[in-house]
């Protein structure tokens, strides 16, 4: 009997389709996360680009100028305070034929692909948390609630002084600190792609709970101060090296993926090329507040 027209068969489920799926799922995860945080679309950068975090100030002159007099110049100063290179990172995952035979492809391949995506997301977020903890707006408060409130207030005050819009404010706090506070309430958290968060909580538009934030600390950053940069794996002439990475469908290629069989070891390798970094434009508009335990 003839196969019904347009039936999807094994011939259409190609390795490249799986590569595209992996790249698309990673991008979709990030788009969901950036939507929660209110961050703009990722910005493409060339490999080797230097990222600069800045401090901005302006010496505003008197605006009461007599008719016909020269208007005095107000001196603006933007000082670079930190540098980071945009670099490509390479990852590889291997699954053996025995693992597929024992657990099936759905577990041995698909589940480990999911775990790989989560780890890649964690690499970017962990580096961002480490950077955010160097923020220069600091104070010590007695309680968790007061720390959150002061963190929000300090970044709003800073952006207002810089005459900049701050949009929504994102707060990052230690997972156990958040749940310790929630223990006496009926509030529950939400989770998206492994990121635990609350919306409109204690004055924060979004509060993200992370074990990468040390206990007893709260970090606040305006969404407009966060930028997600990426290197497009399709930008480089990797084909000249014999490297064929597949990117997702769309204009934002956050990762490149290549799957191949390793016949000499009866295994399958998944290669990932990624260059992503979350960055804050103004380091002096990040609040890092400490508070006493038990708050």
Question: Model-derived features: where do they sit?
Answer:
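Cleavable N-terminal export/targeting peptides
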Residues: 1-15
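Alpha-helix boundary/N-cap detector
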Residues: 17, 21-24, 31, 107, ...
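Extended, solvent-exposed, turn-rich assembly/linker loops in the middle of proteins
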Residues: 136-206
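Protein-protein interaction and targeting regions used for scaffolding, dimerization, and localization
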Residues: 8, 12, 81-89, 278-294
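Long, contiguous amphipathic alpha-helices that act as assembly "spine/axial" helices in icosahedral shell
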Residues: 78-141, 266-276, 280
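Assembly/oligomerization interface modules of large self-assembling protein complexes
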Residues: 15-89
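Sequence/fold signature of self-assembling virion shell proteins
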Residues: 43-50, 192-295
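Short acidic DE-rich linear segments
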Residues: 2-5, 135, 139, 291-295
């Amino acid at each position: 009997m003839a196969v019904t027209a347009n039936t999807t068969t094994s011939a259409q489920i190609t390795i490249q389709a799986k590569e595209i799926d992996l790249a698309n799922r990673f991008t979709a995860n990030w788009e969901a996360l950036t939507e929660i945080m209110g961050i703009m679309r990722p910005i493409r950068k060339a490999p080797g680009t230097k990222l600069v975090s800045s401090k901005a100030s302006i010496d505003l002159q008197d605006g009461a100028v007599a008719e016909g007099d020269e208007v005095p110049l107000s001196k603006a100063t933007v000082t670079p305070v930190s540098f980071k290179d945009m670099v490509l990172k390479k990852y590889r995952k291997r699954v053996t034929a025995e693992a597929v035979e024992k657990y099936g492809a759905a577990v041995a391949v698909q589940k480990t692909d999911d775990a790989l995506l989560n780890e890649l997301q964690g690499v970017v977020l962990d580096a961002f948390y480490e950077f955010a903890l160097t923020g220069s707006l600091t104070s010590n408060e007695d309680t968790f609630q007061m720390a959150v409130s002061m963190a929000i207030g300090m970044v709003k005050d800073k952006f207002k002084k810089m005459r900049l819009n701050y949009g929504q404010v994102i707060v990052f706090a230690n997972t156990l600190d958040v749940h310790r506070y929630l223990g006496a309430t009926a509030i529950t958290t939400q989770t998206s792609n492994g990121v635990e968060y609350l919306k409109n909580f204690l004055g924060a538009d979004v509060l993200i709970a992370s074990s990468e934030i040390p206990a007893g600390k709260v970090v606040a950053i305006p969404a407009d101060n966060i930028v997600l940069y990426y290197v497009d794996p399709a930008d480089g002439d990797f084909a000249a090296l014999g490297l064929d990475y597949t990117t997702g469908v769309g204009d934002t290629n956050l990762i490149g993926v290549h799957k191949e069989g390793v016949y000499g070891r009866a295994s399958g390798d998944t290669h990932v090329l990624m260059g992503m970094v979350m960055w804050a434009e103004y380091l002096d508009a990040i609040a890092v507040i400490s508070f006493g335990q038990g708050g």
